[in-house]
């Protein structure tokens, strides 16, 4: 890791260690479909092109969160700060004793044999994160089209993270896919603009297609009502109504990219939002257990 990289990438905060009490009990077999593992950097150095530098949030710390929340299975999403070297994520999967799967980040010159090797280690999909916070803001369509074809051969999903207004240029391409297609963080739509805004209406239209999935994650990243996040509730309920069998949930731990301690979310508060997003136990069971189990298959063993 170069001194220059450390200088140009500001240090952000780590997650809160205190977890506010849950107001409901997670159903048996619950999944966290979106979390990251960072470091330790002595073993897994950060990419020199990262946009910020978080503290270590290693495998052991995430397992503590799992146990505290009552999560049994998980999908470890490879973070941009580690670049296209997926070692930290795949090692977490290996250490999980069958509880985790991985969604990986790829280099532009990735090959199908490389993806096949990652599948053997527990990878189940590829993530394209090109929102301005992490990338160029534009999708590499040539790479995307090539990798999506390989994902089909591997029975993988494809995962996208983009700025809300990018959905209009992406909609036609995404609508034509035939593999499970996951959209992160409510599509990053702005909740203060309501459910009738063009960005959200386009997301809802996509969610009517049988291969499209959305993650009810990162409410803190789009909300203007911290720490209650109630402005996100109408978006969540709309998505649950439109596609009750294709919405999933995740913690987004360890909540990287925050520099203001007042904005750092509490994992208990974020998890309790499920009571507002999905008021009935049946809805929550679908989101936490049935939907992710069907999407990711019966690969991960119970805790």
Swiss-Prot record:
Regulation of activity: Completely inhibited by ZnCl(2) and CuCl(2).
Cofactor requirements of the protein: Zn(2+)
GO terms, molecular function: 4-sulfomuconolactone hydrolase activity
Assigned EC number: 3.1.1.92
Recorded effect of pH on activity: Optimum pH is between 7 and 7.5. Approximately 30% of the maximal activities are still detected at pH 5 and pH 9.
Top-level taxon of the source organism: Bacteria
Reaction(s) catalysed by this chain's protein: 4-sulfomuconolactone + H2O = maleylacetate + sulfite + 2 H(+)
Keyword Hydrolase (UniProt): yes
Residue ranges that the Swiss-Prot or TrEMBL entry lists as coiled coil: none
Family matches, as Pfam families: Amidohydro_2 (PF04909)
Keywords: Hydrolase
Main enzyme class: hydrolase
Family listed: Belongs to the metallo-dependent hydrolases superfamily. Sulfomuconolactone hydrolase family.
Role played: Involved in the degradation of 4-sulfocatechol which is a central intermediate in the degradation of substituted sulfonated benzenes. Catalyzes the hydrolytical desulfonation of 4-sulfomuconolactone to yield maleylacetate.
Subunit structure: Monomer.
Protein name stated in the entry: 4-sulfomuconolactone hydrolase
Source organism per UniProt: Hydrogenophaga intermedia
């Amino acid at each position: 890791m170069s001194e220059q990289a450390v200088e140009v990438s500001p240090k952000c905060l780590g997650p809160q260690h205190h977890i506010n009490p849950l107001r409901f009990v997670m159903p048996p077999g619950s999944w966290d479909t979106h979390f990251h593992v960072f470091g330790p950097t002595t073993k897994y150095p950060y990419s020199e092109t990262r946009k910020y530098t978080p503290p270590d949030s290693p495998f052991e710390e995430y397992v503590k969160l799992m146990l505290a929340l009552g999560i049994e299975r998980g999908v470890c999403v490879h973070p941009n700060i580690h670049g296209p070297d997926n070692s930290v994520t795949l090692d977490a999967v290996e250490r999980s004793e069958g509880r985790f799967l991985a969604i990986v980040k790829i280099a532009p010159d990735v090959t199908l044999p490389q993806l096949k090797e990652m599948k053997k280690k527990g990878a189940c999909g590829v993530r394209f994160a090109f929102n301005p916070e992490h990338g160029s803001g534009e999708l590499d369509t040539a790479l995307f089209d090539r990798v999506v074809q390989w994902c089909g051969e591997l029975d993988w999903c494809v995962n996208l993270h983009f700025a809300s207004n990018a959905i209009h240029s992406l909609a036609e391409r995404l609508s034509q896919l035939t593999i499970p297609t996951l959209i992160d963080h409510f599509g990053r739509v702005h909740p203060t603009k309501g459910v009738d805004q063009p960005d959200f209406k386009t997301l809802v239209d996509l969610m009517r297609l049988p291969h499209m999935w959305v993650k009810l994650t990162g409410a803190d990243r789009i909300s203007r009502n911290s720490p209650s996040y109630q402005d996100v509730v109408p978006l969540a309920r709309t998505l649950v109504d439109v596609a009750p069998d294709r919405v999933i949930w995740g913690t987004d731990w360890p909540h990287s990219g925050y520099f203001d301690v007042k904005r750092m979310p509490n994992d208990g508060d974020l998890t309790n939002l499920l009571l507002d997003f999905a008021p009935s136990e049946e809805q929550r069971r679908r989101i936490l257990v049935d939907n992710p189990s069907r999407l990711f298959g019966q690969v991960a063993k119970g805790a």
